A protein has these predicted regions:
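A cross-family "folded-core" feature that marks the main globular domain of proteins
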Residues: 2-281
Length: 281
């Protein structure tokens, strides 16, 4: 998409300018060097900027970003714009522009905490790697980039958090919603281990399959998608594997309670099959 010429209202730094246009009373343009040597009243042609230019048009996001650049180093802002471009290029997807706020804010203040000697933990790290393998791999590369460019070594815990931001941005889902779904999955896993008296191997293929099923089950319930299963199969599972079947219904109760949406009966069949596979090992 070709961006039109804009008139600069204010230069926030060399990489961030507030502009206006006939069709956009106010827009924040982000791009390395876009504000260099510019002042209010100057015209800016995004096509003349070597690096990719991003737009923030949502008023709330504009307000959040203005506040963010008051506290974040200008070079870091420019570096994060490179990171966002790297994510788009690597995934071949457009990203939700909120990532400029969410990921920048998260990483900048995480590095501050690390400098102060504070520990960063992520109890859901293995699950995140299993649920979002592509995003996780990309997050590992971003952590390497940060180490190479900024000489800051982020802990492995951060790979998981960055992966969630990437997933949120590439699927246009609120990162809080993504985190909430992961918490529900974590609660379900704890319930499975308690009810079935098993300790699941977090590195096993069966566990990864279960996590993927739970992820899509939670997403289906959240969006109201129906899932059906033959009643004859459900009847056999109920009779042959009563503990797994009753546990499946308990898990559905967790989803219904946490998501405040009804869970289709068909989910019980597929959950029971996964649980039976776990207990038969």
């Amino acid at each position: 998409m070709t961006l039109p010429m804009y008139t600069i209202k204010k230069v926030l730094n060399n990489s961030v300018v507030i502009c206006q246009h006939d069709t956009d009373p106010e827009v924040i343009l982000l791009g390395k060097g876009i504000g260099f040597g510019k002042k209010a009243g100057d015209l800016v042609d995004p096509a003349s900027v070597p690096e990719k230019v991003y737009q923030l048009t949502d008023k709330e996001e504009q307000s959040q970003y203005r506040e963010l650049v008051k506290h974040v180093d200008e070079d870091f802002i420019a570096f994060m714009q490179e990171i966002v471009g790297f994510i788009e290029t690597s995934t071949g997807k457009k990203v939700d522009q909120h990532i400029h706020i969410g990921l920048t804010d998260h990483l900048f203040f995480t590095m501050k905490r690390i400098e102060q000697g504070m520990e960063v933990t992520n109890p859901f790290l293995l699950e995140t790697e299993s649920l979002y393998p592509n995003e996780y791999s990309l997050a590992e590369r971003i952590v390497d980039m940060i180490h190479e460019r900024l000489d800051v070594l982020l802990p492995d815990a951060e790979i998981g958090f960055i992966a969630l931001h990437i997933h949120s941005a590439t699927t246009f889902k609120n990162v809080l919603e993504v985190n909430r779904h992961n918490q529900i999955i974590g609660q379900i896993v704890q319930t499975i281990e308690s009810r079935l008296n098993v300790k699941m191997d977090r590195t096993s293929l069966d566990y990864k399959r279960l996590l993927r099923h739970l992820r899509y089950a939670v997403e289906r319930v959240a969006t109201g998608e129906l899932v059906e299963a033959p009643q004859k199969i459900e009847k056999v599972l109920r009779e042959e594997y009563p503990l797994c079947y009753s546990t499946a219904w308990e898990l559905m109760g967790i989803m219904e309670r946490e998501l405040k949406r009804p869970v289709p009966r068909g989910e019980a069949t597929y959950l029971t099959m996964h649980l039976q596979r776990l207990t038969s090992r």
